[in-house]
Every structure is written in structure tokens, then in C-alpha cells.
Amino acid sequence: EQHANPNFAQRVLADQNLTLIGEELFASYGASIDFRKNPVTESFIASIAEDARELGLQYDVYPSVMIAQAILETGSGGSLLSKAPYDNLFGIKGWYNGNSVSMKTREDDGTGNLYQITAAFRNYPNFRASLTDYVSLIRGGTGYNQTFYQGVWRSEANNYLQATAFLTGRYATDTSYNNKLNSLIAT
């Protein structure tokens, strides 16, 4: 059976015979959020995909996870923070080469309750700098723990599902972060 519209096509198999490993992964798959492909998202992906692929290979990071994070963090490149002159694709706080911008953001208290704060976010000269800084953070960790994001590395995570699960509660306070990323990757 095939469903199609101008912006999205999906093939649904009537019988999905999965291997035991596949069934186990499928059971743990948290893609519960319905994202749809659209021209804005497709254009945004095209603007960062090649850099994400190159940097992912170079730094041992899943490009699909990187792209999904950028889509989620920026609303497909539509957020003020992601537009020039800020070019911050990942909502990374702090300073980049001495540059930052203060903006309001919502945080999750770890139980699903949201609250608002004003935070300093890194200000980049372009998307490539934002992507490069992101993989440097994922590979270099935090100032107090260089292996803080080690579970996201391709050499440590068997698949992108494990990588996104590891990011939840570490990279983002959103308790559904991995489900959202998984849904974006599956789309």
C-alpha cells in the first residue's frame, strides 16, 4: 500500500517480519511523534547535510543524529538563534570566540515541567562553524568530563537509537528528546 502527497511519500508493508534483533530494537524505538517532510525542512537539510556527513565521518558522530538535532533545535532553520548573524544550529549555550547572544529559552526540570530562563548562546559566523563546534563538544565533552558524550559516538553506540537515548538528559533537558530525534530521523 502506498500513501503519497506532494511533500511526503511512505510505503507501508502489510507484513513486517522482523528478525529477533529487529523486533527488540523496534520495541525500544521511541518514534512516537509524527513529523512530516516539507519543502522548508528539505531545504534546511540540504544546506547542512554535506557538512554534517563530512564532520560525522571525521569525528565519529552519526550525521543523521546531528541533522535531526539541528532540525529540532532550530525548527528547520526558522528560529531567530539559527539565522544570521547568530547561526547557532544546536542551541549551544556559552561563547564562541568571545561572541554570544542572550535569548529567552525554555528548560525542562527533568519531570516534563517547563520553565523559562534567559541564557547566553554561542554566536557563530556560519553554519559550518556551528556544526564543527557541535562535533567538538560531542567529542571533547565538558570542561569537567571529557567523555561526557561518549555514548553518542558511533564507535560506542551500536545505532542512532542508542545515540539519541544517550543525549536525553545530557545534551537537552527535554525528557522526550530522543523520541523527537528518532521521529525526525525516521521521517
Give the residues covered by each predicted segment:
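Catalytic cores of secreted/periplasmic lytic hydrolases that degrade extracellular macromolecules
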Residues: E1-T187
